[in-house]
Amino acid sequence: SSAASMCIRDSIMYNILDGAPPTDKIVYGTTNYVNGDTPIPKMLSQTLQQQGTFFKEVNASVVGHYAGVNTLLTGNYMFTQGLRNKPLTPTIFEYLRRLTGEKATKTWFIGNGIGNSIPLLDYSTHSDYGAQYGANFLAPIVTFGNSGDKHLKNAKVYHPEEELDPMYKMKYFLDNVWYSQGSALPNIGNTEEEKLEIKQFVRDMFQKKDSGSIAFPPISDSGDLQTIGYACEVLKRFKPTLTVIYLSNVDGCHGNFSSYLRSLHRADHGVGHLWDFIQNQVPEMSGNTTMIVAPEHGRNDDPNGPFGSSFLP
């Protein structure tokens, strides 16, 4: 896209930004005759740029991958912190829960997968905050994917008064083993009622998946779009005060340029669907929800390579 004075001439992200689809034959959509030859229809009658505030510039420092998401969630640049470490400064989840007393099921971090240390960002190691103020983390394409089908789908939801006693005995045994090794077992503070509610949600999602009734966008052919669909289900069920959704497919800064465009186009479609779902399917959140859309961090200027995974579609 090219921009001048807030006016975008062409855009493949026409739910978020103003501008019509490019007239050039760019292969970024779904497939009819040639890979990506059919743009995904627009979801919103009015772009998010028109409905909200468009920030043209951002002051960025360490913005790559984990460090970038860490910075977004904590408001602090992580110059020396690498992967496989939880944030050193409190996350927005912790600030919300500690300062307002919000319960755990009102705070969610939904990620597209469990790689790149993303699950570590649900709370920090700060001594004044930490796990007890963290967010519930969900990686839906893992939880409800092949691994979930194998290990969780047919798991029993135990009656809290009649059947949980032997389960608690096992839990306490395992907890004590953890404590005996000198570590505290992290706990974000879901009450027993909240835990049961989450278990029932997981069970319901497997049923909805089998019946084809998950709130997916009209096009859901990527991990990002499927993640958006499950995020809609979380919003519908729990009406969270704060939800962060991480879409990783757009993180293709050194890969196939055509695939990069497709991921951007699909992210736009998913964000449009998410906003439409909030306004029309979750009355408790319609009209009183703020959505902040942060872009991916750009890519190099290399074209598609002639060989291997970078070959033009």
PLM region descriptions:
Residues 1, 267-308:
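Metal-dependent active-site segment of extracytoplasmic phospho-/sulfohydrolases and closely related
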